[in-house]
Design a protein with these regions (language model features):
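Non-heme di-metal
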Residues: 1-190
Length: 190
């Protein structure tokens, strides 16, 4: 468990959340265009609404708009790969939400939503893995590939100078949490 960050990191965390919520909103929209199970599509629609609300909340808090995209990001077309990507990014988002609530306890609803999102995708990943065979192997390969690309992504998220004294510890913590979750759900082995 990380120690709470000092108040000097508040704006940087809020700005990072603004970017992350914008990215999540676009990723969830793009995911809806893929071939996903019916129950997942319903969740993604609700998830999109929540992300849009979060985005507006952060825009108001910061007094700035997020940068709108003109095209949806490319998302994996295979559900087993898409589920791993969404689970991974939601796990990272959950850790940032925990950091945020350490600075802004009034934003606990963001943390609660992130816990629901992670729980949903964790359940979906477990469902995929219980199928065994090539489907489960494909999910594990996707997790390995996604995890290899994660350190530079987390480093970008922590680029703000206010994070400098904590950057290494934060990066180790976030990557460690992802590794623990991937191990616990069965996406990776030690």
């Amino acid at each position: 468990m990380m120690q709470p960050l000092p108040s000097s990191c508040e704006r940087a965390i809020l700005e990072q959340f603004l970017k992350a919520e914008a990215m999540a909103l676009w990723a969830v929209r793009a995911a809806q265009a893929q071939d996903v199970p019916p129950g997942v599509l319903q969740f993604l629609r609700r998830h999109e609404e929540e992300e849009a609300q979060h985005l507006k909340q952060f825009e108001l808090l910061l007094g700035m708009n997020s940068h709108g995209k003109t095209a949806l990001p490319r998302m994996p077309s295979q559900w087993r790969v898409l589920a791993v990507h969404l689970y991974g990014y939601e796990t990272v988002g959950l850790e940032f939400a925990r950091l945020l609530v350490g600075l802004r306890p009034d934003l606990i609803s963001i943390l609660k939503d992130e816990e629901v999102h992670v729980g949903f995708f964790e359940h979906e990943v477990r469902t995929i893995l219980t199928q065994g065979g090539p489907v489960a192997d494909g999910a594990r390969q996707a997790a390995q590939s996604w995890r290899r690309r994660l350190p530079p992504t987390v480093n970008r998220y922590l680029h703000d100078e206010s994070f400098a004294p904590f950057r290494d510890e934060l990066q180790r913590h976030i990557l460690g949490v992802v590794d623990e979750r991937f191990l616990a759900v069965g996406l990776s082995a030690r």
